[in-house]
Regions:
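Alpha-helical transmembrane segments and their immediate juxtamembrane cytosolic regions
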Residues: 1-366
């Protein structure tokens, strides 16, 4: 078996740090705002590595087992949506978990049945953006349009599939190609920004050409940078964050919302970034230690059925927004620490031959 490429964990780790910068729920000006805009491309790195890890699973997993798992991944993932929007409207918006599910399944089908050559992945990635940019807004409303095309907010199929496909290309291409792509996209970004920069061009949901160029620059730049390192220290905190990036996703957001609720948003922004990062790192260690005592209870379908029902039911029966956030955060963290058990259960239910547990779509080892 090919040795695991730790650069994937490193890329996920840096995207975790960028998430903290991007998700502080305050609006800043000057240098801090520039950092926030650039950090907003963190999902691009998430999705890119998810595309890569999917291709590594094609020969080891059946589509049926992936389909069952990612349907539940998307549903339980609404816990994350509900932390941002603690009401039933959250079910109408595509966020990180839902687009990961769609992106992973799409890459799997593409890789397994079409086996496109390397550069076709790049062309398909750009074609996805072209469909978003030139076709999506011209179409009339139709059922599930908010899943396929961006309307207001959310990570819809077009244009965000581009990052999954682009990640596969970046991983398989030589590092020289990654450097060239970084320089070309960065140069084009400078050219299109020469006449002035409008912040409206950097709203990630309704992806513009400047935002695409920024995303490509960061995506290929990250693959170029982290693949230059031949080895990583096992105890590297960046790898730890990348390895447990799904848990990081829920933990950091819960802490950001909690600190904001406590009024800590008045602190200097750099102090808030550091506070959230340290508390997230420590909190993940505590949660994973505690999970050793409860993981065994999630090796059966019944507790997972309870988790799925709870994610959906909480905003329907609980009127208090803070309590919704707390309960959905707990459910999301529980899922993030124990998704392997669910993956194994889904594999066993589809095939009598027990398949290996699914690697974390947002950064676990394969």
């Amino acid at each position: 078996m090919k040795p695991y490429d730790y650069s994937l964990d490193a890329i996920k780790g840096i995207s975790c740090i960028l998430m903290i910068i991007a998700h502080i729920p305050l609006y800043f000006h000057g240098n801090e705002r520039v950092f926030q805009i650039v950090a907003g491309v963190a999902p691009v790195l998430f999705f890119a590595v998810s595309g890569v890890t999917t291709t590594l699973q094609v020969k080891r997993r059946s589509f049926g087992s992936l389909l069952g798992f990612y349907v539940l991944f998307a549903v339980i993932g609404f816990a994350y949506n509900l932390m941002w929007r603690p009401d039933v409207q959250a079910f109408r918006i595509m966020d990180v978990p839902q687009i990961i599910a769609l992106g992973v399944l799409s890459v799997y089908l593409l890789e397994k049945y079409l086996k496109p050559p390397l550069y076709l992945y790049l062309l398909l990635s750009l074609a996805v953006f072209a469909v978003h940019s030139f076709i999506g807004h011209r179409l009339p409303d139709f059922p599930l349009k908010s899943v396929v095309f961006t309307e207001t907010v959310g990570f819809t199929y077009f244009p965000w599939l581009f990052a999954f496909l682009g990640g596969v290309f970046a991983y398989r291409a030589s590092n020289r190609v990654n450097l060239i792509m970084t320089l070309v996209a960065g140069g084009m970004l400078v050219v299109v920004s020469y006449g002035g920069v409008s912040e409206a061009d950097y709203v990630k949901y309704n992806m513009s050409m400047p935002y695409l160029l920024l995303s490509i620059t960061v995506l290929f730049g990250a693959f170029y940078l982290f693949r230059r390192f031949k080895s990583y220290a096992p105890a590297n905190p960046l790898l730890y964050a990348g390895k447990h990036s799904l848990l990081f996703l829920f933990t950091h957001l819960f802490l950001i919302l909690a600190f904001d609720r406590l009024g800590l948003g008045r602190l200097y922004i750099v102090l808030i970034w550091g506070l959230v990062l340290i508390c997230t790192y420590v909190g993940m260690h505590i949660l994973l230690w505690f999970n050793r005592y409860i993981a065994q209870y999630l090796e059966h379908f019944l507790p997972w059925a309870v988790i799925v029902i709870s994610v959906v039911a909480v905003p329907l029966v609980i009127p208090n927004r803070d309590l919704i956030i707390l309960m959905e955060a707990a459910l999301g963290m529980l899922f993030a620490m124990n998704y392997k058990q669910l993956s194994s259960l889904m594999s066993a239910s589809v095939s009598p031959r027990r398949e290996p547990a699914l690697p974390e779509a947002v950064g676990e080892r394969v």
